[in-house]
């Protein structure tokens, strides 16, 4: 018995070795739990039932076919995928009479719409014309009164990618759902299900937008959007429109998500968008956005291929789609009868706060989270203050000094400042892109450095003021209380923001603060209870040996820090070990919450350091915040860690310095991502083409291009110019011309612009609208962009900042000889069709750009414009014709990639072949080749 008691005392006594053991076990447990939670292999099981195995097998076969070629909207690979999907859909729907199929390829669902954005403080209005070939399936439910559920994914890729994750797995999952509900053993669902296999998401979210004009969109109230903004791994719940629909994600078998990502999207920290935006903002639907989210350096590159994907990733998305669909369609849900007057309906419209842990899903409305936060904010001081009054007002048994109270916040502030200096003064200058390859190594270095700094500063202060010490001051409890107050203040701010949660100022991902604050408060109150019951001190103090533990529910820390452990019988005679209760209350759970949140954020966005300087600055701030936050739960106990732990911190920091100086930022597993386009400017030359590559400044971009054979053979220079936000554009004249138009003798054959109508009569000038009309002839093409601006000569006298173009017209076919020019005032604002079925869009503020997307490879674009002449008083009298002119810049894109001898873009193939293995390639625009020409009307 004595040996057992001695063992327990040696483990749980407040000793350096005991504390260090607790710390090590805590970090091992946290890392292990987080790994199990985030691991695809340990958290997702492949199906065991024969039916689901068959579904997964067929979906995997479908994915292999989808990813056979790059399949951007402007490539023949897109037609291949469309036709393959159509054949699979037609085969599946033939089994059930209540399943319908429609193909937008019949030109019944073409759309035209405008979108306004802010560029450099100026309003920019773009109008898009899009010819849809969505594949839409409707599985009619038995209860026609129930609103329908939409499942959506897009079947196009970017030109540089095979689109396995983005969004082949989403499409394969939709096919899996279709196979399930058209299978012989599956009963007809009660709720109607609509499946939208949409096209051209990548450069305008066009497929989702066109679906809203489809007749089957009527009656749809809910949606599940399946996406990919990474390349494999687990599919995460990015965001939900509200709590009402998000809570149903709890029923899927492998839920994975956190509202931290939702906060990032809603606050525009993540710049890429998905079809979710269209369904929510334009369609007014309620739904979820489920997507793969990492790694970003393979996203939109050739690395997003079938070789880099695990079948478990597909099953994770497919199983979640099957489960969510089954939950929503098996009968009525409370959202079907939502009334704004009911309390449940009000909470259903709240933003959702959600997270998952080991396949358990937790979701709450923001209103409930706010109430819980307010209750906690009231309870903490309400309980703590009476104990403080008892301790300092009645018993007066806790004597504090200014040094005791201020040393922890001083240490925290100095350590944070030094850590920032270390980051921005050493890491960034020596290896600024290191977060791309080693984000968690940096977190470990910063974490160890921050702990070490606090250990040295706190114990240094103790050493300086050792002669002024008060024996029973309990610096551990002081640090716990001060940390609790810090969390309390942060929770006030977060709660105030969450109570008024809006898009652009979303705080739904800050829920861990509630738990951190509560845990810290419990530990501090526990310590205050101990002091409240501690006897009033005698007239003199007795110094207690360092290795003795604290009295029952109290503490008697001394300043012999740094002294060796005394491995003898001098343990606590009264058997109290309340420090362990405080440690177990604070450190394990707090550390997991902070690590899990930080891991997800860093793992999701660290690759975006290659996208901009703003992203780089954000990532380094997040790394420092992560390291500091991860340290805080341990800081109240940092006084007591033993020498070996301190030595480990020192070694990590020291080795970290060498690591930062020598580690590679880019490697095979974490490549440098560069963006390519080959461009021809016919205004300058019909014979020359240039390659433009965009990447980060100070990256190996210029070195990579200088080593390409055609560049060295031509002895041409690679010219690099800074563009925006830490990016640079490096270009060189290419000797490898694209081969996209058979029989073309020069690049003039790629793009011809015929001016059909140069202007209207000047009868009403300068007070009437001028009109112009052009035909754009571009063989083997689907995508062109027109930019409008006044003529250079007009700019001198123009008093207007807005675009002069007020109306654009896309002619459906050959213009009728009897067609009369439509009077401007008779055209309604926004989109309309004239009597001949031509597509018309009018915006009196001005139209800066027209984006054209068509399906017929060889059909010409036929476009008309109406614009306001620019004039001044001088112009009215002199009627200078120069002020009537309009420049129309036409740029057309090609995305067709051949292989080997049939290579259509040899300059791109050369870069793929000769670049170092640490480089991955993506497109920088709609296509991989662009040809431009400017005409003046």
From Swiss-Prot:
Membrane topology (Cytoplasmic): 1-16, 395-407, 459-475, 532-580, 640-643
Pfam families the UniProt entry points to: Peptidase_M28, PFF1_C, PFF1_TM
Chain residues that bind Zn(2+) 2: 166, 202, 300
Entry keyword Transmembrane helix: yes
Domain of life, per lineage: Eukaryota
Site (Transition state stabilizer): 299
Keywords in alphabetical order: Glycoprotein, Hydrolase, Membrane, Metal-binding, Metalloprotease, Protease, Transmembrane, Transmembrane helix, Vacuole, Zinc
One Gene Ontology CC term in the entry: vacuolar membrane
Annotated localization: Vacuole membrane
Transmembrane segments: 17-37, 374-394, 408-428, 438-458, 476-496, 511-531, 581-601, 619-639, 644-664
Glycosylated residues (UniProt): 106, 140, 606, 758, 870, 887
Binding site for Zn(2+) 1: 154, 166, 227
A GO BP annotation: proteolysis
Name of this protein: Vacuolar membrane protease
Record lineage: Eukaryota, Fungi, Dikarya, Ascomycota, Saccharomycotina
């Amino acid at each position: 018995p004595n040996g057992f008691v001695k063992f327990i005392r040696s483990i749980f006594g407040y000793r350096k070795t005991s504390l260090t053991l607790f710390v090590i076990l805590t970090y091992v447990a946290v890392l292990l739990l987080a790994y199990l939670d985030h691991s695809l292999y340990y958290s997702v099981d492949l199906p065991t039932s024969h039916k689901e195995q068959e579904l997964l097998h067929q979906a995997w076969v479908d994915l292999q076919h989808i990813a056979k070629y790059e399949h951007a909207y402007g490539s023949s690979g897109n037609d291949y995928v469309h036709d393959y999907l159509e054949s699979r859909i037609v085969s599946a729907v033939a089994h059930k009479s209540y399943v319908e199929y429609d193909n937008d390829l019949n030109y019944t669902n073409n759309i035209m719409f405008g979108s306004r954005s802010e560029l450099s403080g100026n309003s920019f209005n773009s109008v898009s014309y899009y010819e849809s070939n969505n594949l839409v399936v409707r599985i009619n439910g038995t209860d026609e009164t129930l609103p329908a559920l939409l499942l959506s994914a897009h079947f196009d890729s970017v030109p540089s990618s095979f689109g396995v994750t983005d969004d082949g797995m989403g499409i394969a999952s939709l096919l899996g759902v279709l196979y399930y509900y058209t299978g012989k053993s599956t009963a007809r669902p009660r709720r109607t299900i609509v499946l939208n296999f949409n096209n051209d998401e990548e450069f305008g979210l066009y497929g989702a937008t066109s679906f809203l004009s489809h007749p089957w969109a009527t009656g749809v109230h809910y949606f599940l959007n399946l996406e990919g903004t990474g390349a494999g791994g687990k599919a995460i719940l990015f965001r939900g429109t509200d709590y009402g629909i998000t809570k149903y994600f709890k029923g899927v078998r492998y839920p994975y998500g956190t509202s931290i990502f939702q906060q990032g999207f809603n606050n525009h920290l993540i710049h890429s968008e998905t079809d979710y935006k269209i369904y929510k903002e334009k369609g007014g639907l309620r739904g979820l956005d489920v997507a793969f989210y990492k790694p970003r350096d393979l996203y939109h590159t050739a690395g997003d291929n079938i070789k880099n994907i695990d079948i478990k990733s597909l099953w994770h998305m497919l199983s979640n789609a099957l489960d969510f669909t089954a939950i929503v369609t098996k009968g009525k849900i409370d959202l079907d009868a939502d009334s704004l007057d009911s309390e449940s309906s009000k909470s259903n419209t709240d933003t959702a706060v959600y997270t998952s842990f080991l396949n358990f899903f937790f979701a709450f409305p923001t209103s409930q989270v706010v109430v819980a936060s307010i209750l906690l904010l009231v309870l903490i001081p309400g309980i703590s203050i009476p104990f403080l009054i008892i301790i300092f007002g009645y018993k007066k048994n806790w004597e504090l000094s200014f040094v005791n109270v201020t040393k922890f916040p001083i240490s925290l502030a100095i350590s944070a400042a030094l850590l920032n200096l270390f980051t921005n003064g050493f890491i960034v200058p020596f290896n600024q892109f290191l977060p791309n390859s080693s984000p968690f190594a940096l977190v470990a270095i910063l974490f160890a450095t921050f702990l070490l700094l606090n250990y040295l500063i706190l114990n240094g202060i103790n050493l300086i003021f050792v002669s002024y010490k008060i024996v029973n001051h309990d610096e551990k409890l002081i640090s716990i209380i001060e940390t609790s107050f810090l969390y309390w203040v942060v929770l006030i701010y977060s709660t105030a923001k969450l109570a008024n949660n809006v898009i652009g100022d979303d705080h739904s991902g800050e829920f861990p603060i509630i738990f951190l604050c509560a845990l810290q408060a419990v530990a501090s109150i526990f310590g205050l209870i101990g002091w409240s019951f501690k006897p009033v001190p005698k007239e003199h103090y007795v110094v207690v040996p360092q290795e003795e533990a604290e009295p029952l529910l109290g503490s008697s820390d001394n300043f012999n820090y740094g002294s060796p452990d005394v491995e003898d019988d001098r343990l606590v005679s009264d058997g109290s070990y309340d420090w362990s209760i405080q440690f177990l209350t604070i450190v394990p759970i707090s550390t997991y919450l902070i690590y899990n949140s930080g891991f997800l954020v860093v793992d999701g966005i660290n690759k975006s350091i290659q996208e901009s300087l703003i992203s780089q600055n954000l990532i380094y701030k997040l790394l420092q915040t992560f390291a500091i936050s991860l340290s805080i739960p341990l800081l109240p106990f940092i006084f007591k860690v033993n020498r070996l732990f301190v030595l480990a911190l020192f070694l990590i920091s020291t080795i970290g310095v060498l690591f930062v100086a020598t580690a590679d930022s880019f490697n095979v597993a974490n490549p440098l991502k560069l963006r390519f386009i080959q461009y021809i400017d016919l205004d300058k030359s019909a014979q020359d083409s240039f390659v433009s590559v965009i990447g980060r400044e100070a990256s190996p971009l210029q070195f990579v291009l200088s080593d390409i054979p055609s560049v060295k053979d031509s002895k041409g220079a690679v010219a690099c110019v800074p563009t925006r936000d830490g990016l640079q554009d490096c270009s060189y004249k290419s000797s490898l011309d694209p081969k996209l138009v058979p029989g073309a003798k020069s690049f003039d054959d790629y793009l011809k612009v015929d001016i059909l109508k140069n202007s209207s009569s000047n009868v009403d000038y300068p007070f009437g609208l001028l009109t112009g009309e052009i035909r754009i002839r571009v063989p083997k093409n689907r995508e062109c962009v027109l930019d409008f601006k006044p003529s250079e000569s007009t700019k001198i006298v123009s008093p207007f900042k807005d675009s002069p173009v007020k109306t654009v017209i896309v002619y459906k076919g050959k213009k009728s000889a009897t067609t009369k020019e439509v009077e401007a005032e008779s055209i309604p604002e926004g989109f309309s069709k004239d009597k001949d079925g031509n597509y018309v869009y009018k915006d009196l503020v001005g139209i800066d750009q027209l984006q054209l997307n068509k399906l017929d490879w060889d059909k010409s674009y036929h476009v008309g414009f109406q614009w306001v002449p620019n004039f001044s008083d001088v112009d009215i009298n002199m009627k200078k014709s120069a002020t009537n002119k309009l420049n129309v810049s036409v740029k057309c894109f090609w995305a067709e990639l051949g292989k080997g001898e049939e290579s259509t873009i040899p300059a791109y193939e050369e870069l793929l072949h000769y670049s170092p293995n640490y480089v991955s390639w993506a497109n920088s625009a709609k296509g991989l080749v662009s040809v431009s020409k400017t005409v003046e009307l």
